[in-house]
Amino acid sequence: MELKSVDAALLQKAVLAAAKGLEAKKEWINELNVFPVPDGDTGTNMTMTIMAAAREVAAIENPTMESIAKALSSGSLRGARGNSGVILSQLFRGFTKEIKESNEITVTSLANAFTRATETAYKAVMKPKEGTILTVAKGMAEKAVDLATQTDDVIDFLTQVIEEGDY
């Protein structure tokens, strides 16, 4: 099955699925986190952040890109916990700035949104460190830009972008 674009209703479902997916990997992320500080709560903080956003996104009855973008950005910021949660909220903030005025999202707009998300998150961190969530986001954004000229299938595109972040 090919998917050429994502509308607001599908984006709403995707955000909710992503929140459940992150929650399922919370403990694994907690164990994975050892740099820059092995605090063991990165997965928990990111989960609390995305769940706050997901609650706001789920409450939207007739979704538009603008309403999803607003709920995702504001919900994640208000629910941000710890450094990783704040960075995640800034990734969402940048992503939503890029998509909020769209009727649908294509691989090109996703690549632009991932790039803007990464730029926004880097700017929000006073002293960004490589080897953190920022590095993963940057690698995924770069992969997205490369792929945007190679495929127009959103599923294929996202599968490859996610694989890039899973190194």
Positions of predicted regions on the chain:
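N-terminal loops that bind phosphate or other acidic moieties
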Residues: 1-167
